[in-house]
């Protein structure tokens, strides 16, 4: 079984998360996709809204039979993606995981704790976000792992590829942004 992992604060979840989830399921040929609603993001200053509220909102907006909304990071008590992946691979040794991220995350991926370990342990699917395509493609991670990039036309091979492997997809985009939603006051913690 192949499972895409979309980690994030989801503070709040929005239509952009739904859109990239549907695209990832199809284009990366995934059996399932799990939203890993994180208790907190080590790279962000302000804490997110309550876990209960974010999980509830995620379940309301993402209604798909192959998508699971999960609080497993809180239950595993992991803080960093590399730790979470290590624990998930122990818990589910039969599952082939693919880490999913927006292009905005690839642009600063080199700031993540043990980011090379992530690239070396699971395939990584990168989905375009408004305004972040060029910075992502020129990022440190993209340059270092350029020889391991799977062309978008072969994205269906990513989930079964040996690590390191990554693929950048241009997908239809929405301008939805959790940051902008919070700035407008449409979501408060």
UniProtKB/Swiss-Prot annotation:
Molecular function as annotated in GO: ATP binding; nicotinate-nucleotide adenylyltransferase activity
Pathway membership: Cofactor biosynthesis; NAD(+) biosynthesis; deamido-NAD(+) from nicotinate D-ribonucleotide: step 1/1
Enzyme Commission no: 2.7.7.18
Keyword RNA-binding attributed: no
Pfam families named in the record: CTP_transf_like
Signal sequence extent: none
The UniProt record lists the keyword Signal: no
GO biological process: NAD biosynthetic process
Positions of transmembrane segments: none
Keywords for the protein's UniProt record, in alphabetical order: ATP-binding, NAD, Nucleotide-binding, Nucleotidyltransferase, Pyridine nucleotide biosynthesis, Transferase
InterPro entries per the UniProt record, alphabetical: Cyt_trans-like (IPR004821), NadD/NMNAT (IPR005248), Rossmann-like_a/b/a_fold (IPR014729)
Recorded family membership: Belongs to the NadD family.
Record function comment: Catalyzes the reversible adenylation of nicotinate mononucleotide (NaMN) to nicotinic acid adenine dinucleotide (NaAD).
Name of the protein described by the UniProt record: Probable nicotinate-nucleotide adenylyltransferase
């Amino acid at each position: 079984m192949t499972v895409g992992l979309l980690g994030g604060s989801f503070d709040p979840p929005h239509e952009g998360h739904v859109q990239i989830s549907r695209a990832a399921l199809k284009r990366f040929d995934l059996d399932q996709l799990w939203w890993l609603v994180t208790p907190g993001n080590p790279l962000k200053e302000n804490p997110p809204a309550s876990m209960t509220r974010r999980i509830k909102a995620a379940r309301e907006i993402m209604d798909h039979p192959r998508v699971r909304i999960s609080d497993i990071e809180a239950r595993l008590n992991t803080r960093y993606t590399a730790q979470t992946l290590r624990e998930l691979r122990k818990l589910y040794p039969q599952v082939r995981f693919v880490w999913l991220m927006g292009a905005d995350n690839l642009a600063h991926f080199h700031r993540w704790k043990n980011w090379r370990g992530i690239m070396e342990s699971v395939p990584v699917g990168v989905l375009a976000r408004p305004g972040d395509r060029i910075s992502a493609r020129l990022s440190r991670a993209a340059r270092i792992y350029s020889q391991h990039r799977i062309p978008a036309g072969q994205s269906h091979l990513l989930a079964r590829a040996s690590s390191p492997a990554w693929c950048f997809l241009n997908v239809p985009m929405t301008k939805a942004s959790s940051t902008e939603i919070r700035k407008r006051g449409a979501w408060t913690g």
